[in-house]
Amino acid sequence: MLKKRVIPVLLLKNGRMVKGKKFKDFIDTGDPNTTVKIYSSQDADEIVFLNISKNEISKKKFINIINEASKKCSMPLTAGGGITNLEDVKELIKSGADKVVITTHLTQDFSIINDIKKKFGSQCIVAGVDYLFNKIKNK
């Protein structure tokens, strides 16, 4: 039987953790560095940070958060959001991420998987799927 793993996924927007419903109406839920300490002390198996911000300033904040979190983290750290090229992957790995999550860009350019695999190894790639269910009622 496979071991069950606890892998919290933290959404970050403008450097803060957020929670939303159906990819909107986000509310602030706290500081990511504090949360990393808590999950580390509770022996989570891995932690995932996803940057859902769309601007360059937030991308730099996210890199800094990954850097700080990796120093406090006692488990593998996975980071993603806004990754569109090898340079983005390199920055995250250099900042302390063990793996990267490719989501939206994967549907636009599947070759990025092979590029990452060649440069960093297949062990550091996670494919993510954003799924939004729209219920259509028949009248």
List each model region and its residues.
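Alpha-helix-loop-beta-strand connector modules within alpha/beta enzyme cores
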Residues: 9-12, 57-80, 111-130
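Conserved anion-binding
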Residues: 12-24, 93, 97-139
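Short, acidic/polar
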Residues: 27-40, 84-91
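Catalytic domains of carbohydrate-active enzymes, especially glycoside hydrolases
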Residues: 35-50, 95
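Generic structural signal for hydrophobic
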Residues: 39-42, 69, 92, 116
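Glycine-rich, proline-tolerant flexible connector loops at the mouths of alpha/beta enzymes
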Residues: 46-64, 104
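Conserved beta-strand positions in the central sheet of alpha/beta enzyme cores
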Residues: 48-51, 78, 100-102, 126
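Catalytic cores of alpha/beta
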Residues: 70-100
